[in-house]
Amino acid sequence: IYFYNDWRAATPWGHTRPDYGRPEVRQFLLDNAAMWLEELGADGLRWDATSYIRTAGGFDGDGSAGIADGWSLLRHMNDELNARFPGRIFIAEDMQHNASITLPTEHGGAGFQAQWDAAFVHAIRHAVISPSDETRSMAAVNNALAFRYNGSAFDRVVFTESHDEVANGKARV
């Protein structure tokens, strides 16, 4: 009863998407996040796969339906956690290059302070591992370094390796 029983249930990890519209689910997730911040003293939280919380297929523009309850949950939790734990950092691993993820909720966004910038890692990784200068794009490196969500250099987290980048037999840089 705490998971969707329709098309919204499907994720790449099975039919396991929680029903973000249920008050019990929302409260459980909020209480869990607060526990990490309050009892364990975490300085922030990184939310995994937020695109799968807010969309059925996990990709903006792929034709899959949005999940309004998921978008509402992200906004609600960021509002609540920011109010209760000022100065903590909330980061989305959204991977869709969607600037609304880091817009404040009062401006229609999800309210995260930063999000992972997947485009950065791919441009830098290609430049570093390319065996030939002919295939290396310094313009792509420049664009990756200069990119900003909402005009802010602090709205993104850049990285050259992550658990996703080196998993499943992929090589490290």
Q: Where are the regions that the model predicts?
A:
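Substrate-binding/active-site clefts of carbohydrate-active enzymes
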Residues: I1-G66, M77
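Conserved alpha/beta catalytic core and glycan-binding cleft of carbohydrate-active enzymes
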Residues: G41-D43, T55-V173
